[in-house]
Each structure stands twice: as structure tokens, then as C-alpha cells.
Amino acid sequence: MSEDIQVIVVDDNSPDADTYLERYPELSRPYLEFIRASKNGGAGYARNIGLDHAKGKWLLFADADDFFVGNMYDIINTHVESDADVIYFRKQAVYSDDINRKSPRSGYIDKIMDIYLKTGDELPLRTRYGVPWGKMIKKSLVENHHIRFEEIKYSNDILFSVHVGCLAKKIEAIDTVLYVVASREGSATSNYCLKPDELRIRAGAAFRYDSFLFQHNMSQRREIVSYIRRMLSQDRSLLNYYFKRLDEIYPSKIAALKDICNGCSLKFKVVFYLYSLIIWISRCLVS
């Protein structure tokens, strides 16, 4: 590894971190900085610690179990003098138990990369590449705009990513794979939004994301929609809370209802419209 690369590994206060240096001698390499967090604050907390210790011109992120392609250094070295604030790359997705098997994970990234490379439309790339990995981010962009990860249990990176994308003066997209994301088969859908507080936390992050884009006239699709649909069957009180706030991310309640029900079954539409009517009537009676 070249000496002009700084690698920061942040341990989220795991109980066996004290033995890491003994078990993994490579952590003592001069370019590598091993940091043990004072608490287990989740990925957003750990990433912010990494930001505080970063010294270089560019930032690249990697999640546990994922990895960069073998010629990663050659790729980033080619673009290190770019005047762009963010450089987006293609990713490859594989299964962790067999990296020769391709996974459909994060397929939406392939689609928005295709859109940009074919049409030059920057908006999907700036607003919907919602993960920190797979891109080179100029550190000055993050510092000048005080961009940080949300220190929440789920979806900590969505607001960071949209801030980076939308506040960048210039972006580039390179038709080259830089990063490989690995996942266990079935892990993405097995119990999504069924853990305690998961729906509330993810919906909150999605709403803040939608609100940012709405305020900047950059809305294309609302991330909150899929969570509101879940709320109808999982958490009516949470649905009531966000129903009252739909005007903050839509031009009107009617536009919101049409968007939420778009593509849904007739049964869902009937139940959702009736429930929405009940909420509206109850609000009128209270006022």
C-alpha cells in the first residue's frame, strides 16, 4: 500500500478489541490507524470518528465484509487530481459465502449510473446514490458544509449521501467498478423493518431526506412512501404522525395520497383512503 493512503479502522467498542493487534498484526502497519470507539454508537458514530481523524484530500468509505477491487489504488490515483467534489463509481455485488456469485443487492445504483452515463442527467446520481461507499468524496466538501452521518441505528447514511451529492459543485461518474458489496443470501428482506424501533428510525431518516430535497426543489420520488405503506399495517400512530406532516414534503395532501397509493392493490387503496378520511375528519372535529 502506498504511503499516501491513510486507512482508518474504527472498532465500535467490541469486547475483544484489546486483542486485535495481537491477532491481526497488519493493524500495526504505518499507514493504518486503528481507533477503538468509547461506546457502541453504531455505524454513523463510527464513521464520524473516522471523519474526525481523516487527513487526506479524498474520503472513501467501506463497510465490514465489503472490499475494494484489486486495482483500487490505480483507479483512485487516476482521478486524484480531479476538480470534482464527488466521483461516483460502479459497484459489484456478490454473496459473502461465494464471491463468484453475483447478488442483486443495490441494483438501483447500477440503474442511476446507467442514466447518468447515457443521458448526462445528474439529479438521480446526486440524490439517490444513498450510500457512502463506491465514491470518492473531497474532504473539503464535507468540512466546508459540516456534513456528518446521523448517529442513529438504521439509515445513518442517507442524509449524509444526499448532502454530499447535492452540495457538490461538480460531480463525475466513472464507468469502472471500484467497490464490491457482499451480502448473505436473503439477509436484505428476511426481517426488514420488523426489529424494535426500526420502522420509526428508518421512516424518520427518510422524511428528513425527503424534506431536504423538497426544500431545494429536487424531489423525484419520496423515500417515506414505502414506510408509510408499512405503517398502515404495523403502526397506525406513526402513520397518523406522518400523515399530518405530508404537506412538508408534497405540494398538497391529494398529491401525497396519489403518490402513496400509486401501484398498490385496490384493497390497500380503499383502506388507506378510508383511514386518511378518518384522520382528516378527526382533525376537523378537534379544530
Describe the residue ranges of each PLM region.
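Acidic donor-binding segment of Leloir-type glycosyltransferases
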Residues: M1-R36
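Membrane-interface aromatic/basic loop that binds lipid-linked glycans or pyrophosphate carriers
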Residues: D4, P15, Y31-L32, L239-S287
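Conserved short acidic donor-positioning loop in nucleotide-sugar-dependent glycosyltransferases
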Residues: D11-S14, G41, A64
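Catalytic metal- and UDP-sugar-binding loop of GT-A-like glycosyltransferases, i.e.
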Residues: A37, A62-A64, I174
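Glycine-rich, basic loop-to-helix element that forms the pyrophosphate-binding segment
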Residues: A37-A54
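Donor-binding/catalytic cores of nucleotide-activated saccharide
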Residues: A43-N48, A64-E172, A182-D197
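Short aromatic/hydrophobic "clamp" motif used to bind/position activated sugar donors
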Residues: L59
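Catalytic core of nucleotide-sugar-dependent glycosyltransferases
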Residues: V177-E185, N191-R221, L238-A255
